[in-house]
Amino acid sequence: MAIAGAAVLALPLLADASPKAPLETQKSAAPEPWTRYGNWSKANWDKFNTMRTDASPPVAGFQRVYGPITDGDPEKGKKLAFDRGRGGSCLACHILPGATLPGNVGPDLSTIGNWGRTDWWLYNYIYDARVFNEGTMMPPWGRHGVYTEAEIRDMVAYLKTLKTPATFKDVRDDPNARKREAPIYNPDDPFENPAWGEAELGEKLYSTAGPNGKSCASCHQNAKQDFKTWAARMPYYEPRMKKVLNGEEFITRHARATTGADYRMQSRENTALATYLRTLARGAVINVRFNTPEEKARAANGRKLMDRKVGQLNFACNDCHGQAANKWIRGQYLGPSKNQLGHHPYYRTSQSDMWTVRKRLQWCGVAVRANELPPDAPEYADIEYYLTSLSNGSKVSTPAMGH
């Protein structure tokens, strides 16, 4: 990208010498006003925590349950336990009799009727398990309004009927024996992986003049040489903005200050350019370090945010990718946080679209019923900063594919 009135700088150096890189620092790098992607849920969960705001109701203590529950309907309870539309269903995390692709994040409930748990205990554990375990992964189903009190009584009645260990006709239905299947696609084949086509678009944009009459190539003529390690050292802390910038936000702000192009984060142009630049670093070893007090503070905040409970379902990043890592939520395998970011942006087959790290973070929030933040949110930046360091030593593998 052109640097008007200054010596030509190789962009790979800018992550280390950020004050030398022209940046527009005042405007939002995200579309304004930010609105959720058109094909995502339109629901508003403003009564629950986001990565920025506190709104979720506090733990209310034990609920009163007098004697055995006699008005619960076990058939209704079973239907609720299997209903994916009501928060993912109990099957997302637990084995139940007759289940298809149950998860194993939580304990096997197929014999819970033999455990000797009282109705009071079962009711309160479903209503808000935090009264027993503050750090539980179990969503506060009643306290957060997913299920009514009557529905929870029905679910208790159903659980009390479960006294026989579950059996599976297909080994793939048993999460404790299920194997991860190898992908049927080849991400390195441009005919199979549409991300290569987006990288080609990024290459064209790299040589396309912006409103100021210059292109990225005007100053960075040898892209393959200049960018062979750049992506492996992003994100970086930008002292002029006192925040972390990743590749996509850097592209937005550097282009505005040089070529005059306005490639907003999550636009096709921005993602295509980011994909192209990362392909030039394909095979480079990721190496993000925290040396200054500011860098260490931002990384520490990212680590802290990964433990933050958000949304109506009250999940944290580390619930799924720490405590439950290498287990199954229904048919989805939960990978650990380590070595997760080297392939972004990637083509997500289930969505037929290119996904950046920020879109992935937004999606995780919406999946647990938390309102997402704009893609240039400093909270996401800190999380990506810390997460990328967990991939240190692995290699950039953009463009990739995933389901």
Question: PLM features: residue spans?
Answer:
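Beta-strand-dominated extracellular/periplasmic modules and repeats
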Residues: A55-S56, G61-D71, K79, D83-L96
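Gly/Gly-Pro-rich "capping" loops immediately C-terminal to redox-active cysteine motifs
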Residues: K78, F82, L91-Y127, R143, ...
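Residues immediately within or flanking Cys/His clusters that coordinate Zn2+
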Residues: G87, G213, N314
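Methionine-biased hydrophobic packing positions in alpha-helices, especially
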Residues: M137-M138
